[in-house]
């Protein structure tokens, strides 16, 4: 159902009727009266039209307001969409002209736009930890999804991206949809589409509230076409009843990341040009769809990514090391219980954590023996207790965290443009793309942020951490008072 284009009624008409008694009127007075009437009519018509957005803040702070778009009443709408693996350098005047214009504060519809040169991802720069950071406002060590893959001692099971085990997910920080749906007693509805962690079903997990699940959610489908994704977003927005319609829509685009892992990022690659051009067209169609529905002036749209991508040369035998050459299988089975992740890092879980120091030293020695000093120096073997506090990971603030036991005992961390894989068969051919590096050491991990709509100023802000997205969603909801955000500051405060 298309909500047809009509002016958005953002103001009430409070004019009073006035009784005018008859009296003698001159021609000159009649002309003046007619002229005043014309001016008055024009002013009244103008007051009914949507006002242009200026360059100042336009936060809509009262959720009790409804807005008429010509056919239906609406609450303010917030849309958050993440492009997995999208680095700022992919924003290009030639291949992504719409995103390029937005990033440079140029909009065809006079929208307020806030951008940053880049957004800072959390460590590890992987998909699931960072998407959960954006919807919880916490670092991975604080929200519980400490990596794309880890061992959960509580359930004695392995977490992977396709693991929807409610026992693991219920033991993580509360997402934004749980907060907003709980605070509104179900009146505020959230719809998600493929956002990592949003499709977990808790119905058989009796102690978990229903609000832990988005009111509407869609299952992951990596083959979904972008136009089908857009159609689903507008199906949510076009629901005829105000009480059924979600006020927050959250969606996820996996296409760019999937391509980058296989081929890396090179803007000379015509396949990559085509792919990011399709993503650009998706966002143009989204904004134009909102404009056709006369919803643009009451919609806040945020375009983000979880991390970037770094290219690794897998052909030269120098940039990729193989674990099975470092630690033989029989030795591994004797001391190591689990081995997780590949690429920029490897997480080693020991059968007996008391062995960690000498096994750490052994791995370091075996690396040098297998690959020589020059290559082995690109890989750093550390205990989890030795993470730099600036990474905001294991006990970064000198205190224990609830999810410390999900972090492996020993880590192998590669320098930028280097990677580690488990077996020879895992070594790709040619250039591969990977992510997981700490942003402080690898600018390729940077992500994007573009915010547009009435709650934003028209400006470029300094880079900020992606946990701030959570604060913006709270502000956009106009649901909670500042004292309930439990945050000392927000980018938009």
Curated annotation (Swiss-Prot):
Domain of life per record: Eukaryota
Record has Membrane as a keyword: yes
Region listing for Phosphodiesterase, in residue ranges: 76-438
Pfam families the UniProt entry points to: Phosphodiest
SUPFAM superfamilies per record: Alkaline phosphatase-like (SSF53649)
Family of this protein: Belongs to the nucleotide pyrophosphatase/phosphodiesterase family.
Subcellular location: Membrane
Record's GO cellular component terms: endoplasmic reticulum; membrane
Keywords, ordered alphabetically: Glycoprotein, Hydrolase, Membrane, Multifunctional enzyme, Phosphoprotein, Signal-anchor, Transmembrane, Transmembrane helix
Induction: Up-regulated during phosphate starvation.
Catalytic class of the enzyme: hydrolase
CDD domains linked to this entry: Enpp (cd16018)
Gene Ontology process terms (BP): nucleoside triphosphate metabolic process
Active site: 127
Topology in membrane: Single-pass type II membrane protein
Annotated glycan sites: 62, 69, 112, 153, 441
Residues exposed to the Cytoplasmic side: 1-28
Record function comment: Mediates extracellular nucleotide derived phosphate hydrolysis along with NPP1 and PHO5.
Name of the protein in question: Ectonucleotide pyrophosphatase/phosphodiesterase 2
Annotated InterPro entries: Alkaline_phosphatase_core_sf, Phosphodiest/P_Trfase
Broad class of the protein's primary localization: membrane
Residue spans, topological domain Extracellular: 46-493
